[in-house]
């Protein structure tokens, strides 16, 4: 919501986007459990998040949105879960 508010207030001079990362750095011994929380079955890397930031920085026609970089973890709370 905050991303959209700022995008409306600052356009067209400024583009506002958010990045919502999932598990990247996890406690030792938690890798398997945290990876199971994502649809892709792994935790992310710092490079995964950095690539999303680079994409948004160069996307001249994108504003007011947040990009989930979480391996699909945000979808796990939906009623249609992975079998």
Language-model features: where?
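A short, exposed helix-loop element centered on a Lys and neighboring polar residues
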Residues: 4
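Alpha-helical segment proximal to the catalytic Tyr-Lys
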Residues: 8-12
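Conserved protein kinase catalytic core
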Residues: 26, 76-77
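Catalytic Tyr-x(3-8)-Lys segment
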Residues: 29-48
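Generic structural signal for alpha-helix termini and adjacent loop/cap motifs
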Residues: 41, 58-60, 78
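A short alpha/beta connector and helix-capping loop motif
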Residues: 79-83
